[in-house]
Amino acid sequence: MESTTLASLAAVSVLAAGAQTDMSDVLWLLILGFVIAFILAFSVGANDVANSFGTAVGSGVVTLRQACILATIFETVGAMLLGAKVSETIRSGIIDVHMYNGSEAVLMAGSISAMFGSAVWQLAASFLKLPISGTHCIVGATIGFSMVARGHQGVKWLELLRIVASWFLSPLLSGIMSAVLFYFVRKFILNKDDPVPNGLRALPVFYAVTMGINLFSIMFTGAPMLGFDRIPWWGTLLISLGCAILTALVVWFIVCPRLKKKMQSKCLGPNIADTSGTQLVEKKPSSNGLMDHHPGPPRNYSPVPQTPPADSNKVAFDIGGSAETDLDKKEFDTKDQDCTHALNGSGGIVIPDLSGNQFHTVHKDSGIYKDLLHKLHLAKVGECIGEPVEKPIRRNNSYTSYTMAIYGIHGSLKDGEGGSRTGLDGEKRRSRYDSYNSYCTAVADGEAALEDAALAVGMEDEALREDVLEEDIDELEIDKPEVSTLFQFLQILTACFGSFAHGGNDVSNAIGPLVALWLIYDSASVAPSAPTPIWLLLYGGVGICTGLWIWGRRVIQTMGKDLTPITPSSGFSIELASAITVVVASNIGLPVSTTHCKVGSVVSVGWLRSRKAVDWHLFRNIFIAWFVTVPISGLISAAIMALFYYVILPLT
């Protein structure tokens, strides 16, 4: 009996040694696969991860650095907890791996080809600032190498059709969910004269739904390392509901009173907050005497003559070696009054005649440009502006907004409203002052600016308000400061959950082929039954976060600013609806596109806010990129696989 056991152990040892010897010949493929997999994970981070926090950065609730830190945490955790299930679909759900029995090296070479083709196209798309689907890339690349190695028989076409259908359904469903959610937010909160009461009542519901949905998803996935695989579905449902109710109670009794107190303290005076990227100014604490209220009787803000004597309000700025004239209280009040009426379209403003017609370039960090103009305008807008703050002049950049505000130039005066002013003057009026010397150009064109402001005074108030914003975001709503306060942290929370969902869904795009490589090498089988190693998912998460930190800002700009303006309220609707769609898809093992869900939500909410708010030209380019992703990544993968199959592998 003992000799039989020893003989059996010896036979097993010989077979294992033979298998290990055979697989050692393809060790170089495994090493090459790890290198290319990290590059692929880098490209996924540079392109796909930007979708998670792009709207949060675009609305201004977090900075780019803060977004990268949060994404690093939640992408990695989501990859380890949710990524294993979707990796199974990517690894063995697209092609029939049993066709590669006895030719493991061919399947390993195919996995490398798929990762290479996907990485190249995603890096190219990131360079072009186009958000594309990482799932599209890896699926197309997998089909490409399989067509070279085994022809069309190696592809599961029905599975491919199911995935293709999900590509169209995911943006549609996510867009509908986001639009419906934002519709109710706008109807019951944003459109109210006082949005705070309804907003505070809705906060517990929003937090509870966000927490409950994501907790159910995490637990229903059944992560073995957390013991969730031993909890039945009804237990998962009860735990999720309990946590959601607890979250709602905490928000109602702790968070809401603090927010209400915070907003009441800020309501002592009007606030102008730059939370949407389209506001005119940015609220900053006052550190200069120019911002303080002046003692004395109330000021009279009645209209002033359109063309007061130039000598009465002349100011000399200290630029370089220029002379300086102190502003006493009377002169300061006069200038404040003129500036305010120029902003409201009810009065003119005098352009000082600089001696010698010598103009100085005022750079971005100049004290006169940064302190005097900014603080003077901020103080007057906060104290005595008569227009509602929902429709300020859009800030194309800092130079344009300050210059237009000081000189009373309205944002979108049409050519025909200037009467007989054509030619060179019309060109000056339409210029956007986008360079560093825009301030000097505005001074030189002061006379034309005065005429434009005078023309605007005669227009009706309603028509003037409709003409303030640029044509592309006409009638676009802007969140009030109190609404922004309500939705800021909520959008951060939904963005974090969206990043978590993305880590679970899209880490498979980078690690699925690498998992196949490792398991083939480790077990010498093309269809191993071993689960996905956690350390491989962590490896992919590190590569994804590296790509986000180094190159993620390009696609963040497209998603958060270029496609459509984002506010905290609309960003919350986008984040929550798209996160729910992606998390549910991850739990059923369907590799939907996170990019499609997010872009669908952004476009639908932007269109609901205003039909002209969406950059349809950019959306067309993104849509075209979606359709060419599968064939381009497939062709690149097929070319690399042909090189392996016909040249490299026969030589080894």
Curated annotation (Swiss-Prot):
<comment type="similarity">
    <text>Belongs to the inorganic phosphate transporter (PiT) (TC 2.A.20) family.</text>
</comment>
<dbReference type="GO" id="GO:0005315">
    <property type="term" value="F:phosphate transmembrane transporter activity"/>
</dbReference>
<comment type="function">
    <text>Sodium-phosphate symporter which plays a fundamental housekeeping role in phosphate transport.</text>
</comment>
<keyword id="KW-1133">Transmembrane helix</keyword>
<feature type="transmembrane region" description="Helical">
    <location>
        <begin position="67"/>
        <end position="87"/>
    </location>
</feature>
<feature type="region of interest" description="Disordered">
    <location>
        <begin position="278"/>
        <end position="308"/>
    </location>
</feature>
<feature type="topological domain" description="Cytoplasmic">
    <location>
        <begin position="553"/>
        <end position="571"/>
    </location>
</feature>
<feature type="transmembrane region" description="Helical">
    <location>
        <begin position="105"/>
        <end position="125"/>
    </location>
</feature>
<keyword id="KW-0592">Phosphate transport</keyword>
<feature type="topological domain" description="Cytoplasmic">
    <location>
        <begin position="1"/>
        <end position="25"/>
    </location>
</feature>
<feature type="transmembrane region" description="Helical">
    <location>
        <begin position="163"/>
        <end position="183"/>
    </location>
</feature>
<dbReference type="GO" id="GO:0016020">
    <property type="term" value="C:membrane"/>
</dbReference>
<keyword id="KW-0812">Transmembrane</keyword>
<feature type="topological domain" description="Cytoplasmic">
    <location>
        <begin position="184"/>
        <end position="201"/>
    </location>
</feature>
<feature type="topological domain" description="Extracellular">
    <location>
        <begin position="47"/>
        <end position="66"/>
    </location>
</feature>
<dbReference type="GO" id="GO:0035844">
    <property type="term" value="P:cloaca development"/>
</dbReference>
<feature type="transmembrane region" description="Helical">
    <location>
        <begin position="622"/>
        <end position="642"/>
    </location>
</feature>
<feature type="compositionally biased region" description="Pro residues">
    <location>
        <begin position="297"/>
        <end position="308"/>
    </location>
</feature>
<feature type="transmembrane region" description="Helical">
    <location>
        <begin position="483"/>
        <end position="503"/>
    </location>
</feature>
<feature type="topological domain" description="Extracellular">
    <location>
        <begin position="126"/>
        <end position="162"/>
    </location>
</feature>
<feature type="topological domain" description="Extracellular">
    <location>
        <begin position="504"/>
        <end position="531"/>
    </location>
</feature>
<dbReference type="InterPro" id="IPR001204">
    <property type="entry name" value="Phos_transporter"/>
</dbReference>
<keyword id="KW-0769">Symport</keyword>
<dbReference type="GO" id="GO:0035435">
    <property type="term" value="P:phosphate ion transmembrane transport"/>
</dbReference>
<feature type="transmembrane region" description="Helical">
    <location>
        <begin position="572"/>
        <end position="592"/>
    </location>
</feature>
<feature type="topological domain" description="Extracellular">
    <location>
        <begin position="593"/>
        <end position="621"/>
    </location>
</feature>
<feature type="transmembrane region" description="Helical">
    <location>
        <begin position="532"/>
        <end position="552"/>
    </location>
</feature>
<feature type="topological domain" description="Cytoplasmic">
    <location>
        <begin position="88"/>
        <end position="104"/>
    </location>
</feature>
<keyword id="KW-0472">Membrane</keyword>
<dbReference type="GO" id="GO:0015293">
    <property type="term" value="F:symporter activity"/>
</dbReference>
<dbReference type="Pfam" id="PF01384">
    <property type="entry name" value="PHO4"/>
</dbReference>
<keyword id="KW-0813">Transport</keyword>
<feature type="transmembrane region" description="Helical">
    <location>
        <begin position="202"/>
        <end position="222"/>
    </location>
</feature>
<feature type="topological domain" description="Cytoplasmic">
    <location>
        <begin position="256"/>
        <end position="482"/>
    </location>
</feature>
<feature type="transmembrane region" description="Helical">
    <location>
        <begin position="26"/>
        <end position="46"/>
    </location>
</feature>
<feature type="transmembrane region" description="Helical">
    <location>
        <begin position="235"/>
        <end position="255"/>
    </location>
</feature>
<feature type="compositionally biased region" description="Basic and acidic residues">
    <location>
        <begin position="281"/>
        <end position="295"/>
    </location>
</feature>
<feature type="topological domain" description="Cytoplasmic">
    <location>
        <begin position="643"/>
        <end position="652"/>
    </location>
</feature>
<protein>
    <recommendedName>
        <fullName>Sodium-dependent phosphate transporter 1-A</fullName>
    </recommendedName>
</protein>
<feature type="topological domain" description="Extracellular">
    <location>
        <begin position="223"/>
        <end position="234"/>
    </location>
</feature>
